[in-house]
């Protein structure tokens, strides 16, 4: 279900973010074209992050990324975003179940993530998976228009 991101995925990645205004506004101030996403994907692939598409029957339905800290036995979820027409179909849960299995194989014992304090739907979803809030933080001027207020959450896998 999780497939690594590659350079040819720019068009679909762009469409996912255009469907999800909350994420789009964080990453961009104006309309971005596929060429901008091609540039971003190159940065993502060079970065320490690990990026996957969530695939169902050969169709990409979302994007899941995380940062790896194997020496500390930890991973931090970067982004989970599901394309609008595939919301509420269980794809986020399936992606996390596969992700947790990968963590166990890699001896990862703690998973962290951050979530917008106003995103009750996501907070409840993460709580159902077993995550707990352990801190709050403000990212000043996340983009030019607002500060990002978020909860830090964690899940112990052992």
Report residues per predicted region.
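Active-site acidic-Proline motif in GNAT/NAT acetyltransferases
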Residues: 83-85, 89, 117-118
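Conserved active-site alpha-helix within GNAT-family acetyltransferase domains
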Residues: 93, 118-135
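Acetyl-CoA-dependent GNAT
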Residues: 4-10, 15-85, 96-98, 102, ...
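Short coil/turn segments at alpha/beta junctions that flank glycine-rich nucleotide-binding fingerprints
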Residues: 89, 106-109
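C-terminal "cap" of GNAT-fold acetyltransferases
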Residues: 109-112, 116-120, 132, 139-158
């Amino acid at each position: 279900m999780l497939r690594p991101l590659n350079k040819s995925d720019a068009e679909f990645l762009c469409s996912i973010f255009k469907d999800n205004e909350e994420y789009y506004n964080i990453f961009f101030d104006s309309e971005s074209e596929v060429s901008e996403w091609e540039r971003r994907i190159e940065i993502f692939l060079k970065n320490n992050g690990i990026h996957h598409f969530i695939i169902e029957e050969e169709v990409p339905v979302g994007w899941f990324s995380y940062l790896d800290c194997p020496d500390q036995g930890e991973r931090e979820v970067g982004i989970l975003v599901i394309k609008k027409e595939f919301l509420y179909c269980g794809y986020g849960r399936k992606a996390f179940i596969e992700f947790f299995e990968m963590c166990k194989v890699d001896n990862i014992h703690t998973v962290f993530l951050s979530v917008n304090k106003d995103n009750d739907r996501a907070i409840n979803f993460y709580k159902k998976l077993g995550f707990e809030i352990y801190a709050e933080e403000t990212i000043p001027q996340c983009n030019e228009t607002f500060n990002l207020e978020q909860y830090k959450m964690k899940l112990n896998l052992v």
